[in-house]
C-alpha cells in the first residue's frame, strides 16, 4: 500500500508538468517553402499548447490546400504535413489566386507570378487569358503583368 501511494504521488506531480509542456512539432511542407506566411505559421505553432489549438491554427491558414496531423501517443510530438495552394496570379497586390480561383492573402513573398492590376469583376477572365497565352506553344512569350480594363 505504501508503494501505491508513492506511485500515485509521482503521477500527480508529473501529470501537470506534462500537460503544460509545449509540443515538439515537426512540419513538412510538401509543396516547398514559398510564403512568408509559412514563417509566421511556424512561430504560431511553436507557441501552441494543445492539439485543438494546433488544428485551429492550421485551419485558419487560407494558403494551405490540405494538411494532416499525426500525434505520438504519450509524447508531446506532433508531425504535420502541409500542401500549399499553388498561386497562378496576384490581383491588385492583395490576393493570390490558384487554378481553382481560391483566393488567399498576398504576402509579397512570391514575385514570379502574373501581376494583375485593374477593376476585375470576374477572376475567371484573368485565368482564361493566362491559360490561352500559356497554351500557345509556337510563341516564346513570358506573361508577367496584365493591366486589366474593359
Annotate the PLM regions.
Residues 2, 19-51, 55-56, 60-150:
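Charged, solvent-exposed interaction patches on well-folded alpha/beta domains
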Amino acid at each position: 500500500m505504501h508503494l501505491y501511494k508513492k506511485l500515485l504521488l509521482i503521477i500527480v506531480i508529473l501529470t501537470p508538468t506534462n500537460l503544460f509542456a509545449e509540443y515538439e512539432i515537426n512540419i513538412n511542407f510538401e509543396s516547398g517553402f514559398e510564403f512568408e506566411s509559412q514563417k509566421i505559421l511556424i512561430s504560431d505553432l511553436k507557441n501552441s499548447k494543445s492539439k485543438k489549438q494546433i488544428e485551429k491554427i492550421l485551419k485558419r491558414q487560407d494558403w494551405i490546400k490540405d494538411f494532416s496531423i499525426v500525434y505520438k501517443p504519450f509524447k508531446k510530438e506532433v508531425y504535420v504535413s502541409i500542401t500549399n495552394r499553388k498561386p497562378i496570379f496576384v490581383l491588385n497586390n492583395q490576393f493570390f489566386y490558384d487554378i481553382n480561383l481560391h483566393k488567399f492573402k498576398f504576402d509579397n513573398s512570391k514575385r514570379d507570378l502574373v501581376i494583375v492590376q485593374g477593376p476585375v469583376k470576374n477572376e475567371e477572365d484573368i485565368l482564361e487569358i493566362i491559360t490561352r497565352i500559356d497554351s500557345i506553344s509556337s510563341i516564346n512569350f513570358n506573361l508577367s503583368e496584365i493591366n486589366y480594363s474593359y
